[in-house]
Amino acid sequence: MSLDASIFSGGHGHPFAESTAALGEILEERGWRTRVLLTLEDTVASLPHTDLLVVNALYWSMTQHEKYAPFRERLAFWASDSQIDRLESWVGAGGRLLAMHTACLCFDTQPRWLGLLGGGWTWGVSYHPALGPIKVELTDGGRFELVDEVYHHLSPRPEAEVWARGAVNEGPQPVVWTRRYGEGRVALDALGHDRRSFDAPAHRALIGRLLDWLAA
């Protein structure tokens, strides 16, 4: 396959410019040509020319708590049915999707997004402890430590193959998994709060393995 990657980046509460730059470096080291897109509209329009879509963004309705009220006018977002239709169709026809960190919180009014990812954040159930040192265990052996967040209770679907679990509060939590969707492939890596996570050698290596699996 060719190696054209689009990175959808931006949103609330995270240093997306720096984490997207770090992701771009990892992709380019493995031969991917990258472009960064800042709206879902442009991202969906790019799909016919994209082999891999990376979502490193946080856009959702912001209706769950009044603490988000000051940000709603500028950042609240509702993905349309047609946008989700096009994402599903693109992956199902053979597209590759890598969802990073907050991608599993996006598009909360569209349950099909989590269906495509094979699981993700459930408002009122999922949560994360404060950013800090965490331990990650790989299901095929090995472990590493880094500074990041461990999302709890993401509930991967039965079709998801868990690659890694993170531990900080309630015991090991699935934080990295893959799944097939039609002719396409999807990987979710719920790590990656900021550049420190992407600069951790073991996490970079894990992302590299995910990219290899996606490109297969």
Regions found by a protein language model. Give the residues of each.
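Structural motif
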Residues: 51-56, 186-190
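A glycine-rich, often tryptophan-bearing local segment used as a flexible ligand/cofactor-contacting loop or short
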Residues: 60-141
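Aromatic-Pro/Gly-enriched surface loop or interdomain linker
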Residues: 1-52
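Residue-level signal for short, function-critical loop segments
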Residues: 11, 103, 192
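Short, flexible loop segments at the rims of nucleotide/cofactor-binding pockets, characterized by
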Residues: 29-35, 73-77, 140-142, 164-167
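Catalytic beta-strand/loop cores that center a nucleophilic Ser/Cys/Thr
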Residues: 21, 112-196
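Extracellular ligand-binding/catalytic regions of CAZymes and related secreted enzymes
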Residues: 2, 19, 29, 39, ...
